[in-house]
């Protein structure tokens, strides 16, 4: 658990993991804050893909949600990962009513010019009270309606490692949404 990029020697560890017989695909999930200076080295070490957890594109919200609070560092990490060939870069976005559900179109817009795969994830309610209650969950159908003009991507034509997600694309977009 935890953020892998804070581990000293993460590039060397990645190289060792990539060299294990039978491992054909190596990916990493990260908050992206430390990714920019490490992306090229990780790619050279054998990392193939990254998943970046990013729940807002608003700097003020980002600062309130995270301890490090530097949205610009995460966005630089996203660009560095793409430039290093760690792709498709996937953004995991947990959509929460009243927190970031108004940003669904902005996240979808990121896919127009970038080879990103934005994955909108439903909030998993935990308990009857508190922040993670069911009333904050945004159903898939509601997320989908916030992104008009999406076309389904044929099965098998979506991003590698996409799992069971339904994948869509805006007409003419480089990236995809799932």
Residue ranges of model-derived segments:
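Auxiliary Fe-S-binding modules of radical SAM enzymes
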Residues: 109, 113, 120-126, 130-178
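Glycine-rich, proline-tolerant flexible connector loops at the mouths of alpha/beta enzymes
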Residues: 1-4
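Radical SAM/AdoMet-radical enzyme domain recognition
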Residues: 7-111, 117
């Amino acid at each position: 658990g935890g953020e892998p990029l804070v581990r000293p020697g993460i590039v060397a560890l990645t190289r060792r993991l990539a060299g294990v017989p039978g491992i054909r695909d190596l990916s990493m999930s990260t908050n992206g804050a430390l990714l920019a200076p490490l992306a090229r080295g990780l790619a050279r070490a054998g990392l193939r893909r990254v998943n970046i957890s990013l729940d807002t594109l608003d700097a003020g919200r980002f600062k309130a949600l995270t301890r490090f609070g530097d949205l610009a560092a995460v966005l630089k990490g996203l660009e560095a990962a793409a430039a290093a060939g760690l792709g498709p870069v996937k953004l995991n976005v947990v959509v929460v009513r009243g927190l970031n559900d108004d940003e669904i179109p902005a996240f979808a817009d990121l896919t127009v010019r970038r080879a990103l795969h934005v994955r909108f994830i439903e909030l998993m309610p935990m308990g009857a009270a508190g922040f993670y209650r069911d009333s904050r969950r945004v159903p898939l159908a509601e997320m989908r309606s916030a992104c008009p003009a999406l076309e389904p991507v044929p099965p098998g034509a979506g991003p590698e490692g996409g799992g069971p997600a339904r994948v869509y694309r805006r007409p003419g977009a480089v990236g995809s949404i799932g």
